[in-house]
Amino acid sequence: MAKTLKDLQGWEIITTDEQGNIIDGGQKRLRRRGAKTEHYLKRSSDGIKLGRGDSVVMHNEAAGTYSVYMIQELRLNTLNNVVELWALTYLRWFEVNPLAHYRQFNPDANILNRPLNYYNKLFSETANKNELYLTAELAELQLFNFIRVANVMDGSKWEVLKGNVDPERDFTVRYICEPTGEKFVDINIEDVKAYIKKVEPREAQEYLKDLTLPSKKKEIKRGPQKKDKATQTAQISDAETRATDITDNEDGNEDESSDYESPSDIDVSEDMDSGEISADELEEEEDEEEDEDEEEKEARHTNSPRKRGRKIKLGKDDIDASVQPPPKKRGRKPKDPSKPRQMLLISSCRANNTPVIRKFTKKNVARAKKKYTPFSKRFKSIAAIPDLTSLPEFYGNSSELMASRFENKLKTTQKHQIVETIFSKVKKQLNSSYVKEEILKSANFQDYLPARENEFASIYLSAYSAIESDSATTIYVAGTPGVGKTLTVREVVKELLSSSAQREIPDFLYVEINGLKMVKPTDCYETLWNKVSGERLTWAASMESLEFYFKRVPKNKKKTIVVLLDELDAMVTKSQDIMYNFFNWTTYENAKLIVIAVANTMDLPERQLGNKITSRIGFTRIMFTGYTHEELKNIIDLRLKGLNDSFFYVDTKTGNAILIDAAGNDTTVKQTLPEDVRKVRLRMSADAIEIASRKVASVSGDARRALKVCKRAAEIAEKHYMAKHGYGYDGKTVIEDENEEQIYDDEDKDLIESNKAKDDNDDDDDNDGVQTVHITHVMKALNETLNSHVITFMTRLSFTAKLFIYALLNLMKKNGSQEQELGDIVDEIKLLIEVNGSNKFVMEIAKTLFQQGSDNISEQLRIISWDFVLNQLLDAGILFKQTMKNDRICCVKLNISVEEAKRAMNEDETLRNL
């Protein structure tokens, strides 16, 4: 919300104690540990305070209107910000699902079974526009979007003040619902606000989520009866001995599920000796729904019908003091009977009076066992597996409430509930042979995904077919970097998520795994299982859990999962087991898994993966070719839309851009501008865009490189503009280096000379307030981008060093390996010389390199100055070399990109003709 204190300009952070007294920095250090404090923000201009439980009206740029939130927490000094403001989201009337509303509150009405548009229109006419619906969805607020403080009241107070309310400030809340606008539950908003202020933020959010969940019936089991005061022996019978929670007049609740075993359960089956309880005989049951940092539950032994209970007599000294009645005369004040008292575990002492078991040891054992227990070990049979779609911890239901930023990007716009999707446009033709053409006609791809319409349609059809039929499939997407592979897949998933949100297709879970972001390849198992179940297991336990989930869990008890494996090249291992597992899971009958693998290598399956993996990838392969110059031109025009003929204000002394309030008109702005500030119009010529797209398309077809060239060209044009008018940066006048060395091809030189006069005329035509990006600026940017310092260095190397690199590139092309032995490179150099024996220049070079035809010096087996050439390439960072005694079998590898090495070699005319 505020990364620095500068972002809090106009606001101050206030901290108060339990009595409401303001605490300064010195008092904070003197306060005792555990003392409760409250934080709130105060605006200096009007004294408005924002704290927990307050409702605020914020501007919503995506919806073009305002939204209302209830502040839940102020986080100070986080990892990225000085202060963060997190709030619960209210839904307004147009964000509610009208059909779900009428089904819940008017189930017998005659208005049911009507078209969806009918409910939208009816609800817009009858709904109270100032009624809000509270949700448990968290969102981070930005202070610059703050409008005003909202006055939220319950239904009874609203009825009293109904005729005298401010529609922009006063609101009423009667229900809490899910973020999708369904399942309404009656609440008292005043009680909710009081509860949020009283408890911790995490507990408050869990409380609100529990309100929207369906209530579960729990069996009530009576707790232990009170012992007689005179009794000094304890009898534990009809069960295995267990350590129990001892409370005053408290009834315990126990889940009677016998098919599901928690991963923290520890089975104990040894016999017990009279008067002594062994540490191995205690079992700790950890509630999965509680936080791991809570105090652990006291160990209990489960009832077993097979074993016969024993009576264990405890001496007077062995009985815990907590089970004895409190003293009558003196003693501490009794605790609230509604709150259970945590007691120490009943443990015996050995002869040396050392405790048998420690709490923290049992807690660590339970945590460790949980991380190593796979999902498959928790069920005794397949029939015992519950419906995973109804469990709140599965499929990221809890994490989505916390990750509101990601959720806001994927959910539909809040302006209207129904969004027209591709599915809704072509659903009638989905079974026809013209479905691909219909998809291409249904959306204007030029507005957000130019030149990738066919690839979009192919991926969309494959993914849609698998989701609709509850089947599994694999989609292999390949192409060079920067051709729109990941962007296209994300647009497909975004479109499918919109259709899923409107119940057009079944719901599914989307997981994105990037191979470059994994510390080790096996981390992908942990990431995927964490997204599916919300648990964090070891990679081995996660892999076993995923195997069981995709193979054994029935289809009707789980969702479809769409996994994007981006940067697949980085996940290839020597054993290839990771790739095999992911692609093999899609062959299971119950999988419901869609794997979209994105790689930068066209023939990765055939080159680096075995036959068993290649056969499981299938035939759905979509190849992304490089962009043509026309497509790159369209992309640049799309990205630069709104840039041409845009204005900015610049300080002529410092060169800094000045931000001007857009509310005022041009005349008012000119009157308020200082003398040193000028208004400048930015313009990029069509010829500059044309040459940028053509040059990049001829090299790689990388859209990112083309945009990078345009950005750099704009920076060069800015420097030219500042130098032309004598302006400066930070008080220093900009001077262009006219003697700066540039490397151009012959074709580039002719193009620059032919356009130089035209650019000079354009500069003369431009007035002082126009900054134009000409073709010369683009050529300089291309020279910097395409001809890097590495390429410049390599073009100036000796012919011997160039011949070495050229031979290395030839070997890499022949056998497809990145590492080559030095002996093979020497043989390749000799082969190149023999093959080009008709080339007089090559033959003369060979005589020089191997000292051939000399009377005084015998012919050399190695190239002359071999060690010098090799060390020169190693010191420059162009090569990696393996350290071995035998140089001939040492392996070398390029430390630069292959494209840069090829481009540098192509600069040499002799090597280009070999």
From Swiss-Prot:
In the UniProt record, does the keyword Nucleus occur? Answer: yes
Question: Which UniProt keyword terms apply here?
Answer: ATP-binding, DNA replication, DNA-binding, Magnesium, Metal-binding, Nucleotide-binding, Nucleus, Phosphoprotein
Residues annotated as domain BAH: 48-188
Q: Which residues bind ATP?
A: 435, 479-487, 567, 600, 704, 726-733
Coiled-coil annotated residue ranges, if any: none
InterPro entries (UniProt xref): AAA+_ATPase (IPR003593), AAA_lid_10 (IPR041083), ATPase_AAA_core (IPR003959), BAH_dom (IPR001025), BAH_sf (IPR043151), ORC1/CDC6 (IPR050311), ORC1_wHTH (IPR048867), P-loop_NTPase (IPR027417)
Skewed-composition ranges (Acidic residues): 247-296
Please give the residue positions where the record annotates the modification Phosphoserine.
S237
Subcellular location, record wording: Nucleus
- Annotated stretches, region: Disordered: 218-343
Q: How does the entry describe the domains?
A: The N-terminus is dedicated to mating-type repression.
Note, other = Present with 3930 molecules/cell in log phase SD medium.
The Swiss-Prot or TrEMBL record describes its family as follows:
Belongs to the ORC1 family.
User: Which protein are we looking at?
Assistant: Origin recognition complex subunit 1
